[in-house]
Amino acid sequence: MKVLHFGTLVASQGGPAMSTYWALYGLRQQGVDAEIIMFPLREGDVLRGEEVPVHYVQSVPHTPLAYASSCKRDIQNAGVFDIYHAQGVWLWSTYALVDVAKKLGKPYLITPRGMLYPQDIAKHNKGFKKLSLKWRLLDDLNHAACVHVTCKDEMMHCRNLGITSPMAIIPNPVEIKDYPYKKEDNKFRLGYLGRLSLRKNVEALIYAFADMGEMAADAELLIIGGGDDKYEQFLKDKVLELGLKNVVFAGFLNGEEKDKALASCSVLAMPSEFENLGNVILEGLVRRIPCIATTGAPWEELNTEHCGWQVPYTQKDITDAVRKAMCTSTEELSLMGENGRRLMERKYSVEAVAKDLKVVYQWILGKGEKPEFVYEGKKSDVNAKTAFVKELHQGKLFV
């Protein structure tokens, strides 16, 4: 079985690169000839790993569609595959991959990567997204052999848009291995790992430290990541404005540097308004670090598996969670960390996720039964599609 993904393996892209790499790596370990095509590397770009065959588009992408003139030709030149799998929406690369698959009479999948959440649709470029849906995206999604989502919430949002294709709920994978670095001090250190952008709500952690005053005086907030320069400056200005001396900006870290920084953390936090999964939680729990997330992400298991805290998306609740974590004994944090590691081994390993993807591919090719985690569209979904398309053409959406 040959499968071609279009996505990215550039390490600085964070979660999407990590999850795509390990999914493809795992598929190859399962005997699937899984490859990827991606845009050309820019100066300073580093690949997430070297164990997956990579093809490159020859032309540079341009906004807002990330249009690249040679995209279709380069996909065709990569060879003929049994299945084509696009990562993300709103991108020319997805349309190009779908066009090639249709031309060759091959099935294709689309992974929205959280881009079809209502909050993500509404945050910017609403007119462009409305045009994209009306022009062809909704049609492409509804002709996909399967849409891959990471949780039930993401599936619900897709159904609400009128997407009637079968949907496979498969989480992102994380590499299960022993990490050589251990925490070397007794300081409570709250870590954030990921892209710095407005919707990540990193300022909530800064406000939490400010609200706790003397209680947090001996603790530290470690912010690991880069991205939006203006947003990063906003965060740094807030730290100065609030007079905090215990907030550290580490910038983007990779490899050994990232492992050492994460090992120094007592707890990791993901205060985002919404996430379709959130790889920072995977990165923390696999390292036996308890985590904090909001109910905007599908991490009920932090509470049910006693490996962290999932709280409502309010400043008060986020601050209370940080306070609880800070007041938790080292022994209890260690127990929570072990619980998290066992959860990762059981459900989120590269092997487990790759097996599920392979089963979906086999089902699409008529070589297996429909997996229990694949959900067919219902009549109500068709009705939702009809209503959505009507509103879309009447211009009532994204006002």
Predicted regions and their residues:
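N-terminal subdomain of nucleotide-sugar transferases
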Residues: 1-43, 48-50, 373-399
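Conserved donor-binding/catalytic core segment of Leloir-type glycosyltransferases
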Residues: 4, 148, 174, 182-209, ...
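Membrane-proximal helix-turn-helix segments that form the acceptor-binding/catalytic region
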Residues: 103, 129-146
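Carbohydrate-associated surface elements
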Residues: 153, 173
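Nucleotide-activated donor-binding/catalytic signature segment of Leloir-type glycosyltransferases, i.e.
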Residues: 233-253
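Aromatic "clamp/platform" in nucleotide-sugar-dependent glycosyltransferases that forms part
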Residues: 273
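Short hydrophobic beta-strand element within catalytic cores of glycosyltransferases
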Residues: 290-294
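Conserved acidic donor-binding segment of nucleotide-sugar-dependent glycosyltransferases
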Residues: 309-316, 325-330
